[in-house]
Amino acid sequence: MKAFTKITAIVAPLDRSNVDTDAIIPKQFLKSIKRSGFGPNAFDEWRYLDHGEPGMDNGKRPLNPDFSLNQPRYQGAQILLTRKNFGCGSSREHAPWALDDYGFRAIIAPSFADIFFNNCYKNGLLPIVLTEEQVDRLFKEVEANEGYRLSIDLAEQTLTTPGGETFTFDITEHRKHCLLNGLDEIGLTLQHADKIKAFEEKRRQSQPWLFNG
């Protein structure tokens, strides 16, 4: 998993509430269990003018010019700004996979669906909860300023605007540690590999019958 420390990046606005996981990555693309390759189909039904299916050449598909993420000013964005209850609907880890593969490192919203929120942390995405008033202000600034960038410092738990205004956000110490060090659940377990090995060796000596056959 990629570590997250600090970024300064373009912000892309998605001015919609209750964006569900089927909108983030439609169900027909869920057959693969690889974590990569979902980016071109993120927001597929809004992003393209035709219906997408696995195996299609996305480079030849007609883009929807009215979809915000297709606008030239938001290309290369690594921060997604959106509205309340983002990631609702069915539980699918493919949703954060698709957003990560698109290039997003952080998502800002007033609220997130619980399962999606947890899945973001497991896949190196930083979900940031701000108040609706703060999110409204950011939407206005993004709209008014082309190339608008925010700076996020995870260690300090701060988000800073180009004008120098700083917002703070909450995150548990455990999740912060994992993101700062790029640790998923496997990586976190491997940090204790020596202790696990020592425990198993001690148990092998004290309870050898468990290891016979």
Swiss-Prot record:
A Pfam family annotated for this UniProt entry: Aconitase_C
Stored InterPro entries: 3-IsopropMal_deHydase_ssu, Aconitase/3IPM_dehydase_swvl, AconitaseA/IPMdHydase_ssu_swvl, IPMI_Swivel, LeuD
Catalytic activity: (2R,3S)-3-isopropylmalate = (2S)-2-isopropylmalate
Key words, A-Z: Amino-acid biosynthesis, Branched-chain amino acid biosynthesis, Leucine biosynthesis, Lyase
Assigned EC number: 4.2.1.33
Pathway recorded for this protein: Amino-acid biosynthesis; L-leucine biosynthesis; L-leucine from 3-methyl-2-oxobutanoate: step 2/4
Segment forming the signal sequence: none
Listed GO CC annotations: 3-isopropylmalate dehydratase complex
Molecular functions per Gene Ontology: 3-isopropylmalate dehydratase activity
GO biological process entries: L-leucine biosynthetic process
EC top class named in words: lyase
Source organism superkingdom: Bacteria
Subunit structure, as described in the record: Heterodimer of LeuC and LeuD.
Assigned protein family: Belongs to the LeuD family. LeuD type 1 subfamily.
HAMAP family: LeuD_type1
Function: Catalyzes the isomerization between 2-isopropylmalate and 3-isopropylmalate, via the formation of 2-isopropylmaleate.
Protein name per its UniProtKB record: 3-isopropylmalate dehydratase small subunit
The encoding gene: leuD
